[in-house]
Amino acid sequence: IPMWQSALILLLISAFFTMAGGLKAVAYTNVFQMLLLIFVSATLTIAGLYKVGGVSALAEAVPADYWNLFRPNDDPAFPWLPIILGYPIMGVWFWCTDQSMVQPVLAAKNLKEGQMGANFTGWLKILDVPLYILPGIICLALYPGLKNPDEAYMTMVTNLFPVGMVGLVLAVLTAALISTVGSALNALSTVFTMRSEERRVGK
């Protein structure tokens, strides 16, 4: 299936369940795909570490600078100064002002539940390193000849997982994509309603 047709189908599916269920449907989908994505990513990390021979073998198989977060300021990819100055701004913009992130918190039943949800999300971000960053480093150790880094995740999935698990991963990634698009559509509809339709009807 061509890429544009796949994107169109996923967009239509996302639009359908968003219009039918609203923010509640988006929230349930987010929880569902979160649990599955954590399970799949944790399984992939464990399988990758087992294949490469453990943490010690992984540390020896990749360059030492892969474990250094603060690189020289003349580093072409990750200079420390732009990262320290730029990432907090990007983080505040996305997590604190983006409508698709803010709207679920504002839709909480009360202030306490909204605070608990935001706090829980912050703790989940700790899992990014073992679940999403570490598999990329493991892939470098296992498949150093891989030319396209965008294919790292699925390369590990197809080589380390049985056929049934590969199907589950595809379903999880599809659910995550639909969830992201659904959140964006729901946020867009809210902004459009508040900024355009509400003013027009009010007049």
What is each model feature region?
Residues 1-25, 40:
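Transmembrane alpha-helical segments of multi-pass small-molecule transport proteins
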Residues 5, 24-25, 113-116, 167, ...:
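Residue-level recognition of membrane-helix boundary sites in multi-pass small-molecule transporters
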Residues 7-11, 30, 40, 118, ...:
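Residue-level recognition of transmembrane alpha-helices
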Residues 12-16, 85-92, 161, 171-181:
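Hydrophobic alpha-helical transmembrane segments of multi-pass membrane proteins
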Residues 35-167:
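Loop-to-helix junctions at membrane interfaces in multi-pass transport proteins
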